[in-house]
Structure formats: C-alpha cells, structure tokens
Amino acid sequence: MAIQTQLPCDGDGVCMRCQVTPPSEETLTCGTCVTPWHVSCLLPESLASSTGDWECPDCSGVVVPSAAPGTGISGPESSGSVLVAAIRAIQADVTLTEAEKAKKRQRLMSGGGDDGVDDEEKKKLEIFCSICIQLPERPVTTPCGHNFCLKCFEKWAVGQGKLTCMICRSKIPRHVAKNPRINLALVSAIRLANVTKCSGEATAAKVHHIIRNQDRPDKAFTTERAVKTGKANAASGKFFVTIPRDHFGPIPAANDVTRNQGVLVGESWEDRQECRQWGVHFPHVAGIAGQAAVGAQSVALSGGYDDDEDHGEWFLYTGSGGRDLSGNKRVNKIQSSDQAFKNMNEALRLSCKMGYPVRVVRSWKEKRSAYAPAEGVRYDGVYRIEKCWSNVGVQGLHKMCRYLFVRCDNEPAPWTSDEHGDRPRPLPDVPELENATDLFVRKESPSWGFDEAEGRWKWMKSPPVSRMALDTEERKKNKRAKKGNNAMKARLLKEFSCQICRKVLSLPVTTPCAHNFCKACLEAKFAGITQLRDRSNGVRKLRAKKNIMTCPCCTTDLSEFLQNPQVNREMMEIIENFKKSEEEAEVAESSNISEEEEEESEPPTKKIKMDNNSVGDTSLSA
C-alpha cells in the first residue's frame, strides 16, 4: 500500500501537499496546535473527531494505516502522544497567558523545552535571530521590529531576493535590504550578557576564606596579618543575638539564643567590639547606625562633639560629618564645613519623623556627662527623637545638625532607683531653638508610643520590616555580585537611551538607519507634518510634493517608516527586565548600613580612609 502523507498549510496559507492556497471555509484549525489544514487533502479517517475541538493527525495520536509507514509505532506509545500530552498540559495551565502558551507550544513543536535551558540561556533567548534562532551576530533590526544576524539578513533579503520579514511578512524596503545598519544598542546588550557570564565564572572560581559565626571565638581576634597592635585590626567575635542589622527597638529574649533573656538595660561591655556582638550598636567606630532610606537604629554617646548635652532622660545629640578626615585621619576636632541632613543625619531625621525607637549606648569617653559609665560601654535603653534642627555649633563657624532625644523605655534607667520604666514626659525647653533653622517637629503619631491601657511602651504601628539578610556570608556574597553587575547594568541602560529625550527608551522603535527612539518622542517630533504637501496656489495646480522627514540623528528620510512605526518588542522586554533589576538593586542598596564594615574573614592590611560618618572615637575599644 502506498504511503499517503498528510501535511498542513504553511505560514503563507499554502497547502504543503497540493501547493494551493485554500479559502478559509475549506480549512480546519487544530484545537491543540492551532495549525491550519486543507480539508480536501485530509484523509476521511482524520476528519472524524470524538471531541468538540478538531485535532490534526499530528496531535490526535491516532495513526491512520494508509498514512503511515509499516514500521511505525502507533497508539499511545508513540512519541506524538507524549507531545500531545505536553501540549494539553500547557493548554490546561490557567496561570499562563495566551501569548505564553503559544511560546511554550512553539518551543515544544520545535523540539526544545524549558527543562534543559538554564537561566543564562533563557536570558540570551530574549534576543535571537529570527532565522538561525541564535544570539544575533552584528544584529540588524527591520522596520517591523524583528532582529536578524547581518549575514542571515543578507542571505535572506539579498541572496534569495525576499523582501518580506520571515516572521510577520511585512514588506522590507529595498534601501534597508540593500544597506542594512547594525543596531548598536543590541550589540551592547549581547556584549553585556557575555561579559556577565565570564565574570560570573571567574568569581565562582575565586576562593574566599570565610569564618562562619559558630566558628568564631567569643571575643574579637587578630591574626599574624594584623598591621597594628591591639584591636585596631581586629575582626569581630561571635554574634550572640539573631537580629538583623536594621532591627529597631529593644532586643527581645526571642533573639537571645544563649541566655533567652534579651539585652537588658544597664548591661556593660569592655569595648565597642563586644557591644556589637550583642547587636546593641553594630558600628565599632561610627556613632550612628542606620540607613538614610530606612532610619537610624542606634547611636553612641562617646564625646565626639563638644555640642552634645547629656541630661540623662534627654540629651541633645550632634549629627555626623563636616570634618576633614583625609590623610587616613580617624578623628579631627575642628569643624571645616556645614553638616547636612543626608546619609546618617537623614537616617536620624527619618527616625524622628516616623517616631522609631533608637537604642542608646554611653561610653566612658564622654567625660563631660554625669551619666556616662566609669569604664566600658553601657546600654541605656531606647530613646525617641522628638525634634531636629540646624544651628551654628560652639566653634561658631559652621552649622550642625542637632537632635533632641527623650527616653521612652519600659525598664528604668541605670542611674535611677525606680522600679518602673519611663512615663510620657513634657519636652524640655531648648534655648538654642530660638536661632534654629530647618526645624522639624513630628506631627503625626509615632510608631513607638505609650499604651495607657497596658501601661507600657510598645509598637503602636507595625515596625519596619528588615531588608537585610541575617547570614553574614550570604550578605557579602550578594554584595559582591551586585557590585560587579551594577556598573554594567548602568552602562546598558545608558546605551538604551532615546536620542531625543535622552531617557531610557519607552516603547522603542528602531529606524532603518539603526537609531533608537521612544515611539512617542519620534511621533511628536514630526507631529503635524503630512506625508505630502499640496503646492496648488489657486492659479494653477501642481503635483503634490513629498515631505522629507529627516532622522533626528542623521540625514535618512523616515517618511515611509513613520507611516506605521513598529515597536521592537524584544528590546522593550530587555529594557523592562534591566529596569526591574535596577530597582531591586537600589532597594537593596538603600538598606545597607552606610558605615564600612570591617572584613570579618581577615583583618585589613591596607590603610582605609574613614568616612565623615565616624563620630568622635579615638580608638576601637570605645
């Protein structure tokens, strides 16, 4: 018996068996793979369908004897049945859109799949040549918005003389086919993908010596690599609490895994290194711990500024910055510029605005205060910032950021004999407010307040959610990865900029001269200009003249292209993905503590220029 092969219609609607273009009423569309078939070329056995939607011979899984070779495998054991089952599973997935279902069906029909494609390959598949289905080499973008390799495009348009896009069948202008232009924005995207992969492999091969928290000693330690004696180059000891670095308020017993009592008011430590091991104040040099976009979690009173006034239950605190720390200086008592509400100062102002509790530690270095401990560092409870302002400091030259802290803790202060904690108290009079500028007073209800019914301080609003990973090694790994990729992503977004508005492309269109513009910007550039200009003057009628619409970047005429400019969808998806990753990176970056953390794996061996956020410490041992 002769084998009768059944074939569907191609992309142009031509039957692949009889080479005739049938009318729509003489075609059947498969309900599974959405492929048109010529009814006259189908065998009668294939036209019978037991379900409501007709299925083509390829999807039905039923092999017609007259249409199959004698050695074929039929029935549900055939590979076609597996393919049909996979397609039906895609169709039944309610979480997918119609476009996503179509992509998955096409990938299955072409012999590909998701399981064998890793994340890097998936990223590359966002940009591919529509002919060779590979990363385009010297990419060319047609006016219809599809991308090709330069060689593939020349072979298609010049070698074979086909002036229609193989994807959408749109007409390709002759001047584009004759002189295609390389899309430099796509070149940058492909280069970034390749460089990112290479840098990722190189980073993975690098060995990092990491000491996990459970393997650390109980106290700060040094190694033979330490340049200075004492604790100047010491690494941190073991952390005894499980709070993240952006934790607000007291440290509860649930986070004290060793004692199950939390950190109590009045606890003291030998130095700032031990203090940070209990999570009360993490920076071992800087006086403010916080993030400008999140708030300040803790401050240290250690005599860094002569402007500070300590009255126990309330104190006036001075912000950071305004001092020259160049030349590897750690401390400079001379104020050389004005302080501004940014970085750590902005973090304190945000805590004032939101009414967050701020942990306060006092150091023995504060010699002018009657409430400072005689030795070491002591935790004195949580305070709330009620006001902040700017005023000229005691040196009389530059403005300082000033803050009014008022105690609001459920435990009594270490210098009192009370058995209960604080109660709401009136704000003290501050004489320097008469000459203050940039005064800010919180008007809305604070997040940390006093509950009259329960008689204690508590969170009146939900506390801020932590944005930082608890695991130190995981945090450092993410930091290294973001540091390597942020510069490349910023460069890529710069490459994907509109040549008119100079912003990141929105609905990008690629002109025949390979320049990229926002669709709205390009249309607005030529708004009100018609394709033809009427030259009749009332006396005699002349032929209409074509208006030349010159590209904003070159002398190419875009009049034909502007009749129906098509958005480059692949480029738009790439831009959206990178913008999303940039936003995630910015959110993660804003949650990082701005003070530089010491290298917890090994002590540093080179000099480090301290940031102006360092306040008042003359040694690491507080």
Curated annotation (Swiss-Prot):
MF (Gene Ontology): histone binding; methyl-CpG binding; methyl-CpNpG binding; methyl-CpNpN binding; ubiquitin-protein transferase activity; zinc ion binding
Top-rank taxon: Eukaryota
CDD domains per UniProt: RING-HC_ORTHRUS_rpt1 (cd23138), RING-HC_ORTHRUS_rpt2 (cd23139)
Biochemical pathway: Protein modification; protein ubiquitination
Annotated GO biological process: chromatin organization; protein ubiquitination
InterPro entries: PUA-like_sf, RING-HC_ORTHRUS_rpt1, RING-HC_ORTHRUS_rpt2, SRA-YDG_sf, SRA_YDG, UHRF1/2-like, Zinc_finger_PHD-type_CS, Znf-RING_euk
Xref: SUPFAM superfamilies: FYVE/PHD zinc finger, PUA domain-like, RING/U-box
Record key words, sorted: Chromatin regulator, Coiled coil, DNA-binding, Metal-binding, Nucleus, Repeat, Transferase, Ubl conjugation pathway, Zinc, Zinc-finger
Biased composition (Polar residues): 611-622
Zinc finger feature spans (RING-type): 129-169, 498-555
Region annotated Disordered, chain positions: 579-622
PROSITE patterns: YDG (PS51015), ZF_PHD_1 (PS01359), ZF_RING_1 (PS00518), ZF_RING_2 (PS50089)
Catalytic activity: S-ubiquitinyl-[E2 ubiquitin-conjugating enzyme]-L-cysteine + [acceptor protein]-L-lysine = [E2 ubiquitin-conjugating enzyme]-L-cysteine + N(6)-ubiquitinyl-[acceptor protein]-L-lysine
Name of one Pfam family that matches: zf-RING_UBOX
Presence of the UniProt keyword Metal-binding in the record: yes
GO cellular component, one term: nucleus
EC code: 2.3.2.27
Residue ranges that the Swiss-Prot or TrEMBL entry lists as coiled coil: 566-602
Residue intervals of the YDG domain: 258-407
Residue ranges covered by zinc fingers (PHD-type): 12-62
Function of the protein: E3 ubiquitin-protein ligase. May participate in CpG methylation-dependent transcriptional regulation.
Domains: entry comment: The RING fingers are required for ubiquitin ligase activity. The YDG domain mediates the interaction with histone H3.
Record's protein name: Putative E3 ubiquitin-protein ligase ORTHRUS 4
Encoding gene, per UniProt annotation: ORTH4
